[in-house]
Amino acid sequence: MSDPQRREFLVAAAGIASLATLSGTQPAAAGDPSFMNNVPDPVAAGKELPTFKFALEKSEGKVIGNSFGKEATVTQLPISKGIAGVSMKLEPGAMRELHWHATAAEWAFVLEGRVRTTVFDPAGYAETNDFEPGDVWYFPRGHGHMLECLDNKPCHFILIFDNGYFSEFGTFSITDWVGHAPKPLLAKTFGLPESAFDSFPKDEVYFARGKIPPTEPSVPLEGWKLPPETHRYRLLAQPPHGTFQGGREWRVDSTRFPISKTVTGVILDLDPGGVRTLHWHPNANEWQYVIDGDVSVTLFGSHGRFRTEQLSKGDVGYIPQGYGHSIENIGNRPSRMLIGFNTGVYQTIDLSNWIAANPLDVLATNFSQPPELFEKFPHRDVFIAAKDGPGK
Ligand code: MN
Ligand code: MN
């Protein structure tokens, strides 16, 4: 062994030793990001790839009145350790009460109706925003917030959390806390008689129900203290990030929406027969929700493992970080998907682009083909292909 080789060997050996220590003492657990890169995830380590599909909108979820929250966590979809999602509908006058998520940031996309949110941060800033279909919000992990339906018609939105376990030990609601805190403690905290809390709810309300909110929100007790970074981004009000023969994509990460440090969101439209071509994401898991249409999603998991799932409107899919995949519209009308990544900076490696970037002799040897064959391959990243192949 030469000296540089020996040095590399020693560094690698030290890495294996520390990995063994880690895996020997600690199974992969919620909030432990190490499982994504180092410790094999038992859910995805079997001979066959597990299912990566869950029929979210067909599930029952939590229903109060005409409002609901349906969730996809590791309980419903065991492979989805990095990201959880919720479909939530609020009836007019309903509010998802003041709460926070101890172990997840919240990213959302509005499908129908209008929503108002107020979010409060540790610097003492609060922002109240109104949202329309196509708009996005992001609340950093642990920041207090509420969501309420505006107007006389229901609203429907999809929430994405950067932790697949978030539901089990993640949601802290204000009524749950106040309802269980001793009255003398509440009296001292707020400078009120204990009796002031007699008729407060005793248990978590979750969906509070009241009047339809005013056109303009009423002023908080301490007035408005607006944060330096907004929590709202109007995704579909922008032109698409990329337009191709076969489809188009809108994308927002922290480069355009600075507060969104841990989530990237995408709206992917595919024409019939269109394909988001074979690719992987080096730095993030991918969570998919079909807004409309029928798609076929493939997953490549190494060691010959390959799995295909068909997703339709209301279904959820999940692609682990670094796994190869593709999405094809197999219906006869356009498809639209909401896709979330647990990263603030979007990255992709597309197979077409990787091939185009390698020396021809490498490709020839690798595939046992004449080098001239590869001249016919695309000389660029395809990203989205149309029904009859890559556009110009
Ligand atoms: Mn929330
Ligand atoms: Mn992808």
Where are the regions a protein language model picked out?
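Glycine- and acidic-residue-biased ligand/ion/polar-headgroup-sensing regions
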Residues: A102-P122, H281-S302
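Mobile, glycine-rich extracellular loop/lid and propeptide segments
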Residues: E97, W107-V110, R116-V119, T128, ...
